[in-house]
Amino acid sequence: MIDSEALESERVKLKRDIADLRANLNRKEQCLRELEAAIAAGEDSDEAEESSNDMPTPQTKLTNDDIARYSRQLILQDFGVQGQLKLKNSSVLIVGMGGLGCPAAQYLVAAGCGHLGLIDYDEVERSNLHRQILHSEHRCGMSKAESARIALLELNSHCQIRCHSRLINSMNAMHIIRPYDVVLDCSDNVATRYLLNDACVMLRKPLVSGSALKMDGQLTVYGYGQGPCYRCIYPVPPPPEAVTNCGDGGVLGAVTGIIGAMQALEAIKVIIGLGDVMSGRLLIFDGSSFMFRNIRIRTKRPNCHVCSAQPLITELIDYEMFCGMHATDKDNPLDLLEPDQRLEVKEYHQKLQSQPHLLLDVRPPAEFEICQLPRSINVPLSEILDDSYLKRFAKQLEDKELPIVLLCRRGNDSQIAAQHIKNRFPAHSIRDLVGGLHAWTGSVDATFPIY
């Protein structure tokens, strides 16, 4: 007997795949045209990157165009001509051309930073566009570094921009960072934070660090003057299950814009010696109440493994191993459960879905409202961890034969929930869905929305 529902799902999936391929082809052709135009203009970033690590001869005079363009900041008493010249001769590396890196780069280029390095391994996606303001719809599929470079050169064609379209790691970090004066950590990634911190300490480069999640943001400067480094504050990385990125926790685009702009400001202050740099202090921004807090953080740790007088770490290490997590925010799956405690979405669809069971969706209510599987019940992870779900499901939990299936967006929070419930009810059949709703869309129902 023909399964019309399955055929319709496959038809929709094929149409979506064809549309995606056509859109990707159009994007690639547009990228090719733009890159060929850049090469023809003598601005090929790969050639620039391989040519030399030496920056051009310092400029000692502002041009008439410089004076006209930067006049509003030239007339600032503490900035002036000398400040503009320092900025013109400066070189800044931005690691991560996402929600933080885009506004930071935009303001640095607009202010007249002479040399900018952009590093990002990733390509532009539609889900980036609400906060990564240098990218555009027609550049989806293009390298983020190249996409940002195109937008920045439209803003200021006098800025020299190098693209590093690769993942920064222990093998290439020292070589990439060495020619730059200041580094901006816009990665929002724990393993990369430790990598950049250690490399910048070893190379004596100030590190302007920003982060943003949900409605909150933070900003500080590490390794500046006698201030602490990142390891002084966080000598031990957090457990992987305690880390949330904007892909899982969400973020409001304007929050990343605020923090990224402030990172640019701190970089400018470091370069020209302006004001009181945010070293030894942490700026905390709460977007929901629009409150800024400026708090003191600890001083340099005398026994810091990297920045102390006798460091234990004198060369870069394997930071993914050290942190127990990948150096990207792309599909970082947790591995908390044994294979027999997990359930593939196809197996669930084919066998268990038609049988009595309890399907608990542990996403927050806002995410559950976006989309949900039939018969699923929303029980946020927080309710499971504080055991407030027990009273609600007391009757079902009395039945040890009733299978309990945990579900989330990507299969991480569901593992945490399954582990917690299993510890409390070891005799019950408790499993989570591998890959969560993303896997459901990819393997079962192509019409199910992805976010």
From Swiss-Prot:
Localisation per UniProt entry: Cytoplasm, Cytosol
Enzyme nomenclature, EC number: 2.7.7.80, 2.8.1.11
Residues the record marks as active site: C246, C408
Cofactor note (record): Binds 1 zinc ion per subunit.
Cofactor: Zn(2+)
Gene3D superfamilies assigned to the protein according to its UniProt record, in alphabetical order: NAD(P)-binding Rossmann-like Domain (3.40.50.720), Rhodanese-like domain (3.40.250.10)
Domain Rhodanese: 353-449
Annotated GO MF terms: ATP binding; metal ion binding; molybdopterin-synthase adenylyltransferase activity; molybdopterin-synthase sulfurtransferase activity; thiosulfate-cyanide sulfurtransferase activity; URM1 activating enzyme activity
Pathway: tRNA modification; 5-methoxycarbonylmethyl-2-thiouridine-tRNA biosynthesis; Cofactor biosynthesis; molybdopterin biosynthesis
A Pfam family of this chain: ThiF
InterPro entries the record matches: MOCS3/Uba4 (IPR028885), Rhodanese-like_dom (IPR001763), Rhodanese-like_dom_sf (IPR036873), ThiF/MoeB/HesA (IPR045886), ThiF_NAD_FAD-bd (IPR000594), Ubiquitin-activating_enz (IPR035985)
GO biological process: Mo-molybdopterin cofactor biosynthetic process; protein urmylation; tRNA wobble position uridine thiolation
Catalyzed reactions: [molybdopterin-synthase sulfur-carrier protein]-C-terminal Gly-Gly + ATP + H(+) = [molybdopterin-synthase sulfur-carrier protein]-C-terminal Gly-Gly-AMP + diphosphate; [molybdopterin-synthase sulfur-carrier protein]-C-terminal Gly-Gly-AMP + S-sulfanyl-L-cysteinyl-[cysteine desulfurase] + AH2 = [molybdopterin-synthase sulfur-carrier protein]-C-terminal-Gly-aminoethanethioate + L-cysteinyl-[cysteine desulfurase] + A + AMP + 2 H(+)
Modified residues (Phosphothreonine): T60
Positions contributing to ATP binding: G99, D120, S127, N128, L129, H130, R131, K144, D188, N189
Any one annotated GO CC term: cytosol
Top EC class of this enzyme: transferase
UniProt entry keywords in alphabetical sequence: ATP-binding, Cytoplasm, Metal-binding, Molybdenum cofactor biosynthesis, Multifunctional enzyme, Nucleotide-binding, Nucleotidyltransferase, Phosphoprotein, Transferase, tRNA processing, Zinc
Bias (Acidic residues) ranges: 43-52
UniProt binding sites for Zn(2+): C229, C232, C304, C307
UniProt record similarity statement: In the N-terminal section; belongs to the HesA/MoeB/ThiF family. UBA4 subfamily.
HAMAP family xref list: MOCS3_Uba4
Protein name: Adenylyltransferase and sulfurtransferase MOCS3
Gene: Uba4
